[in-house]
Curated annotation (Swiss-Prot):
InterPro entries found in the cross-reference section: IGPD_sf, ImidazoleglycerolP_deHydtase, ImidazoleglycerP_deHydtase_CS, Ribosomal_Su5_D2-typ_SF
Stored NCBIfam families: PRK00951.2-4 (NF002114), PRK13598.1 (NF010121)
Organism, as annotated: Saccharolobus islandicus (strain Y.G.57.14 / Yellowstone #1) (Sulfolobus islandicus)
Name listed for the protein in its UniProt record: Imidazoleglycerol-phosphate dehydratase
Any one annotated GO CC term: cytoplasm
Record gene name: hisB
Pathway: Amino-acid biosynthesis; L-histidine biosynthesis; L-histidine from 5-phospho-alpha-D-ribose 1-diphosphate: step 6/9
Family per record: Belongs to the imidazoleglycerol-phosphate dehydratase family.
PANTHER family (alphabetical): IMIDAZOLEGLYCEROL-PHOSPHATE DEHYDRATASE (PTHR23133:SF2), IMIDAZOLEGLYCEROL-PHOSPHATE DEHYDRATASE HIS7 (PTHR23133)
The reaction(s) this protein catalyses: D-erythro-1-(imidazol-4-yl)glycerol 3-phosphate = 3-(imidazol-4-yl)-2-oxopropyl phosphate + H2O
Gene3D superfamilies: Imidazole glycerol phosphate dehydratase, domain 1
Domain of life: Archaea
Length: 193
């Protein structure tokens, strides 16, 4: 079974279109009005070893909040749909990723209980058109809509760019590992995820 999804989410504020194939490493095309966010999405999807297209239009361009949140929601829904009943997936993963002085831990469980616990000390208030307060919000919206329990903790570092990028790399690597097929079982004592 192909593990991919095409999701379109349109509101009065944004229009988001996501195509995601979690089993085929290929081209990644990202188009949002937030340059640094584009960089982080490319990073996330590259480390997931995926093929993806993300197109985001901001109908009310007040600030970056709606784009960040709505892309997170739509990408989360795409991962959830692509995983189907989650049969055979490894389910759990953790990664500790350095980027120069920054060190970030990501631990996740594809549990169908979406929640995020994010502990990052982001010293800059904005980077590349992105308000850094929206980084934890991205992870929370993504986790809730993908059904992933997600923990992200900064272990060291002071450069905001490095801390954020290490977080997206670690999340991508953890998602790649947790979504790998390891057998034909549902990895849960309940028999469902």
């Amino acid at each position: 079974m192909a593990r991919n999804a095409n999701i379109t989410r349109e509101t009065k504020e944004t229009k988001i279109e996501v195509f995601l194939d979690i089993d085929r490493k290929g081209e990644i095309k990202i188009s949002t009005p937030v340059p640094f966010f584009n960089h982080m999405l490319i990073t996330l999807l590259t480390y997931m070893n995926s093929t993806a297209t993300v197109s985001a239009t901001d109908k009310l361009p007040y600030d970056d909040h709606h784009i960040i949140e709505d892309v997170a929601i739509t990408l989360g829904l795409a991962i959830k749909e692509a995983l189907g009943d989650k049969r055979g997936i490894k389910r759990f993963s953790h990664q500790i990723i350095p980027m120069d002085e920054a060190l970030v831990l990501v631990s996740l469980d594809i549990s169908n209980r979406g929640m995020a616990f994010v502990s990052l000390n982001l010293r800059r208030s904005e980077i590349g058109g992105l308000a850094t307060e929206n980084i934890p919000h991205f992870f929370q919206s993504f986790a809730y809509n993908s059904g992933v329990t997600l923990h992200i903790s900064q272990l060291s570092g002071y450069n905001t760019h490095h801390i954020i990028e290490a977080s997206f790399k670690a999340l991508g690597l953890a998602l790649y590992e947790a979504t790998r097929i390891v057998d034909n079982e549902i990895r849960s004592t309940k028999g469902v995820i």
